[in-house]
Amino acid sequence: MGIIKTLDSTISNKIAAGEVIERPQSVVKELVENAIDAKSTSITIEVEEAGLSKIKVTDNGSGILEEDLELMFRRHATSKIENEHDLFHIRSLGFRGEALASIASVSKVRVTTCHDGSIGRQIDVIDGETVNRTLAQARQGTEITVESLFYNTPARLKYVKSLHTELGKITDIINRFVISFPYIKFTLVADGRVLIASNGNGKMQEAMAVVYGMKIAQDLVEVNGRTGDYEVHGFIAKPEHTRSNRHYMSLFINGRYIKNFMLTKAILSGYHTLLPVGRYPILAINIVMDPALVDVNVHPTKQEVRLSKESQLMELIERLIKEKIWKQNLIPKVEKKKVLETFQQQKFEYDLLREHRDKTKQSDYSEQTAVNQIDEKFKEQHKTAQLDKQRVPDGESTQKTTGFISDSAAELDTTSEILPEKNESSDVIENISTDTSREKRKIPYMEIVGQVHGTYIIAQNEDGMFMIDQHAAQERIKYEYFKKQIGDVGLEMQSLLIPITVTLSKDEAINLNKINILLKDIGIHLEHFGGNDYIINDIPVWFPDNYEETVQELIDYALQHRQIDLNKFREETAIMMSCKKSIKANHYLRITDMNYLLEELAHTVEPYTCPHGRPIIIQFTTYELEKLFKRVM
C-alpha cells in the first residue's frame, strides 16, 4: 500500500491559508478586493481588536447569486477566469479562488448578501463547512463578517504582532485602496472609532490628502504621460517632503498595489540628487496597461509582478518625474510653527537663566560688564564690516553689509580672519564656473546682506529673505563642473613630477582588472611597479589639488563597488571631488565672493540641492517674517 495520500479539503485549505492569510490585514485586503471587483462605490470596514476578534466588510456592489453562496468557499472557485487565456488578461483584483476558502478554514464566517434587488440570503461557515443557510433582510450588496481569526491555528496566532501593529497594517492597506480607487468611498472603523473616511469623488489628490494630510497634498505635483503600451498618472511630492523609507511610495498597475524594485529605481533616478541620502519621496503613481503585459500570478499576495517591456516603462516614469519636478520652485519655505517653537524654547531657556541670575543675586556691575563686552564685540564687528565695504569695487558699493555678533571674541580680532585677502578668496572660489547655458536663471535675483557663522549667506529681495548654505552651493557648482569634465572623452592630462604610488593588497590586486575600465574612463592609469605597488604618472588637468588622496579614495570606491556601471561611477566620482574641494563651514567670504558664488549657482542645472540631496536655499517670505513679529495676524 502506498504512503502518498490526497489531503482532504480542510487540511489543504489550512495549508493554503498559510500563504494567503498571514495576518488580519490579509483578510481585509482580500475582502475589500472582492468588494471592488463587485463594482462597489462605497465600502465600510469595521474591525475589533485589530481584526483578531472581528472583521466586517460591507459594500453596495452587485451582491452574490444564491447558487454561488456555498460554491464561493470552495478552493479555486472563482468568477474571474474561465480558461488559460483569461489568466494572462486579468483585469480584476482577485482571480485565484483561494482567499475565501483560506479565510473560512481559520475563522468563523458569515455572509449576508442581496443580488439585484432579490431576497437577501445568509450563510454561516466554520472550518470551511457550511453550518447554516437562511433568508435574511439585506440591502443591495454584500456584508462579510469574519470572527475569531486563527482560533483553530494557535501557532499562527502566536506570531501575530501587537494589536497596535496589526491595526497599523490594516490602516496601511486601506490607505492604498483610498489612493488607488478615489472614486470609491472608503470608511475604516476600529473599535467604534472612525480612522479613515474618504469621499469617493474620484480625485486622487484629494484622496492623498486623506492619507497624508492637506499640507502635503497641496504641494503635490501631477504627472501624466503615455507611450504606445503604457499610460501613467499620479502625484509626486516635492523633495522637501521625504521619509526615511519607501513606505510612502505607492505604485499601482491597473489599480493593483504592487512592489517592483526596477520601477522604484526609475522613480529615484527621476529625483536624482534632489533627495538627501537615505530619504525617499511621497508619491502615488498608477500605470494603466494591457493586462497581457503584466503577470500578476507570481505570488499568492499578488503584489509581486513581472512586466513585459519593463525598460520602456522605467524610461517613461523617470522622464515624467524629471520633466515635472525640475519645473517647480524647489526653494523650501520655513514653517512658521517650527520657527516659533525655536523662539519659544529660546525664551524658556532665557527665563531659566534670568531666574538663576536673580537667585544668585548677580550684581548690576556684572550685568553691565557683560553688556559692555557684547557692545564692544558689536563695535569691532561693525568696524570690520566698514573696512570690508571700503575694499569693495565701485560697482559693488551699493551692496549692504550687516554685522552679526559672534560667539567667540577670537573671531573678531582682525579683519583678515573674517574676510580673507583677495588671494585667499580667489583660491576659495577658483574653478567653480561651469559652461552651463546662461540663458535662464533657476533662482531669483537677490541682494547679499551678510554672512552668519561663516557658513550661511543671508540675502534678500522683494519676496523675502533667503539663507544659502555656502558649502552646499559650491558643492553643486563643482559637481556639475566635474561631471562634465569626467564625461569628456578627450581628457587633457598633466604629467606628475613625482608619480603617485599605490599599494594594493593581494585581494585588491587580483580584482584590479575588473575596475581598470572604470578608472581609465576618468583618466587614472595604474602601471605595475613591482610586487603589490602601482604608480600613476599622469592625471587629468582638472583633478583637485589633493590628488593623491582623491586617487586613493576613487580606487577604494571602485574596489568596493566592482559591479557599478560606468555612469554611476562617473557620478560618484564627481560627488566625491565636489565635496572635498568646496568651501567649508566657518569660512568667511567677501561680499564680492558671495555674489559670484550665487551668480554661478543661479546658472547651474539643478541649483536647489547639493549632490547629496541637502537643500541649498531656504526662503522666509516677507509675509512669514511679518507674522513672526506679529505685524500681521
From Swiss-Prot:
It comes from the Bacteria. Keywords: DNA damage, DNA repair. CDD domains: HATPase_MutL-MLH-PMS-like, MutL_Trans. GO terms for biological process: mismatch repair. This protein is involved in the repair of mismatches in DNA. It is required for dam-dependent methyl-directed DNA mismatch repair. May act as a 'molecular matchmaker', a protein that promotes the formation of a stable complex between two or more DNA-binding proteins in an ATP-dependent manner without itself being part of a final effector complex. PANTHER family: DNA MISMATCH REPAIR PROTEIN MLH, PMS, MUTL, DNA MISMATCH REPAIR PROTEIN MLH1. Belongs to the DNA mismatch repair MutL/HexB family. This is DNA mismatch repair protein MutL. The lineage of its organism: Bacteria, Bacillati, Bacillota, Bacilli, Bacillales.
